[in-house]
Amino acid sequence: HPWVFEGEVIRVEPSPENGERAQNGCIVDVFEENGTYQGTGLLSEMSKIRVRIVTRNANDRLNEAFWSRKISWAWEHRKTTMGNRALPGTEPDTNCCRVIFSEADGFPGLIVDRYENVLVAQVGTVGMERLRDAIYPLLLEVFSADGQVIDGIYERNDSPSRLKEGLPQYKGWWTGSSSDENSLIAESTPT
């Protein structure tokens, strides 16, 4: 896993840009004792996993363009692994899938599932909690650019693991709403 555990942290230094100490959930650079860059990640002061690495490229800036590229890559990857969805002009085999799978897609602590025209998001880390209002609109933009209709994002942030990060539990619509809480799911259409 791309993690730095609490026992591996020797010190947290102030930011060279503003001289302030990194706060819980902030983006931080990780270095070995000898100064060798190891990656950039999200700080979690309450977790035994102190930093979750997002990139090992020192030139990456974790800005809107960075997250948008990662979302686009994850979505394109899912489309190519979901049967007929990858073939132009064919009906998809399914209208549901896991769009973002946490560390596997470079979004530590974020899971996003698609159920027909609704995205269901689970945020499990303080770093992703701080970034969610920046990432969710990018999800909608990526889907829209691909011709996909998404009516809303529903948050299922009621996992007990959030308490270990010092986060409250809640669930509800981030955007959109549905009078019908059910979605029609198609999977493995017979041929």
Where are these regions (language model features)?
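Non-catalytic accessory regions of SAM-dependent methyltransferases
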Residues: 1-116, 171, 175, 181
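Generic alpha-helical secondary structure
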Residues: 64-68, 128, 132, 136
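Fold-independent oxyanion-binding glycine-rich loops
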Residues: 7-8, 123-124, 156-158
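Non-catalytic substrate-recognition/targeting regions of SAM-dependent transferases
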Residues: 102-107, 111-113, 132-191
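Short hydrophobic-aromatic micro-motifs
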Residues: 30, 39, 119-122, 186, ...
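A short interface-forming secondary-structure element
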Residues: 116-129
